Swiss-Prot record:
Any one GO molecular function term: toxin activity
Protein name (database record): Probable weak neurotoxin 3FTx-Lio1
Sequence similarity: Belongs to the three-finger toxin family. Ancestral subfamily.
Any one cellular-component term (Gene Ontology): extracellular region
One Pfam family named in its UniProt record: Toxin_cobra-type
Disulfide cysteine pairs (residue numbers): C21-C42, C24-C29, C35-C60, C64-C75, C76-C81
Tissue and organ expression note: Expressed by the venom gland.
Family matches, as InterPro entries: Snake_3FTx, Snake_toxin-like_sf, Snake_toxin_con_site, Toxin_cobra-type
Subcellular location: Secreted
Species: Erythrolamprus poecilogyrus (Water snake)
Keywords, sorted A to Z: Disulfide bond, Secreted, Signal, Toxin
Length: 85
């Protein structure tokens, strides 16, 4: 009985969880962004030549973005894991 109750509590707590990521495009950055329930990944996409990460794009995604040949991408599944790499 105790296991059933713990399972129900865990399912209830997890059901409303949404991931939090850093969100940034070329001009505007928001350090704290709540993703939709469908967006289960954080990502950071940057040019390989941009060593400082000044033009990095960060955000939430349902699937990991496919980088262009001159880009790098990092996808992760924990809150605010999409820092500069």
């Amino acid at each position: 009985m105790k296991a059933v109750i713990l399972s129900l509590v865990a399912a209830f707590l997890y059901s409303g969880y949404t991931l939090n990521c850093r969100k940034c495009d070329e001009t505007v950055c928001q350090l704290y962004w709540t993703c939709t329930e469908a967006e289960t990944l954080c990502y950071i996409l940057k040019n390989k030549t941009d060593t400082m990460g000044l033009q990095a794009i960060q955000g939430c995604a349902e699937t990991c973005p496919v980088p262009e040949p001159d880009q790098e991408v990092k996808c992760c599944k924990t809150d605010y894991c999409n820092s500069y790499f």
